[in-house]
Regions:
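Short, His- and charge-rich active-site/binding loops that engage polyanionic ligands
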Residues: 29, 33-34, 40, 47, ...
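Conserved Nudix-box catalytic region and its N-terminal flanking loop in Nudix hydrolases
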Residues: 26-70, 147-166
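Short helix-coil junctions and helix-kink-helix linkers
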Residues: 167-176
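Active-site segment of metal-dependent pyrophosphate-handling enzymes
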Residues: 11-15, 58-61, 65-108, 123, ...
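NUDIX/MutT-family hydrolases
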Residues: 98, 108-142, 146, 155-163, ...
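Long, intrinsically disordered, low-complexity Ser/Thr/Pro-rich regulatory/activation regions
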Residues: 196-225
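N-terminal strand-loop-strand
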Residues: 2-43
Length: 225
């Protein structure tokens, strides 16, 4: 029996992941070289098709785990990209997500197997299809949300210096922050806690290490840096 569904065209649905990391003062993006056509050998975001019995959210989590080995990662849906000719291979509608990961925690063997590499956000090579638009939109969303919620801590190690914290937000916003004002704002946030540990990698004197107390933040969810 012909049904309403049978008489309408069917499309592929995929997910693409914009994976952000932070290292040495730079916001970075994890990219891979495609090993299949179309656009074989070109730089691309990590993606995959949504499988039977799988939600788009679950598909994005699976794709991220397949590339990095990480689970329970902060992810946010960026939007749906569905131009008719966006993929020259087939009609594919893609749902894009951005993810924030600690760059020291991912599975390097998996990343190597996928021929993936980190690129600095301001030095991204040409990307396939509409992936540049996905990255641009994801970065705008990241900047907006990072200004009002403490999502940036997902990019930092559990213990960090104030220099690292300021460098992170400078990388996210794409502009320098006044050191004095930044330190003053940190002092006003009781959920950024100073520990008794010292980081001596930069100097003999060292720098105090801080941590983000999520429970304290949830009691008074106010953030600005």
């Amino acid at each position: 029996m012909t049904t309403y569904y049978n008489i309408n065209p069917r499309f592929y649905v995929s997910v693409d992941c914009i994976i952000f990391g932070f290292d040495k003062g730079s916001l970075k993006l994890l990219l891979l070289k495609r090993n299949f056509e179309p656009a074989k050998g070109s730089w691309s975001l990590m993606g995959g098709f949504v499988q039977d019995g799988e939600s788009v959210d679950d598909a994005a989590k699976r794709v991220l785990a397949e590339l990095t080995g990480l689970e329970n990662v902060y992810m946010e849906q960026v939007g749906t990209f569905g131009e008719v000719d966006r993929d020259p291979g087939e009609r594919v509608i893609s749902v894009a997500y951005y993810a924030l990961i600690n760059i020291n925690e991912y599975d390097r063997n998996l990343v190597q197997q996928h021929n993936a590499h980190w690129a600095e956000i301001n030095e991204i090579p040409p990307l396939v299809f509409d992936h540049p638009q996905m990255v641009k939109q994801a970065r705008i969303m990241l900047q907006k949300k990072a200004s009002s919620e403490p999502i940036g801590f997902n990019l930092l190690p559990s213990l960090f210096t104030l220099f690292q914290l300021q460098s992170l937000y400078e990388a996210i916003y794409g502009e320098p922050l006044d050191k004095r004002n930044c330190r003053k704002r940190v002092a006003d946030l009781n959920y950024i806690e100073k520990t008794d540990k010292i980081d001596k990698t930069g100097s003999k004197r060292g720098a105090a290490l801080y941590k983000f107390n999520e429970n304290a933040y949830r009691k008074a969810p106010k953030f600005k840096l």
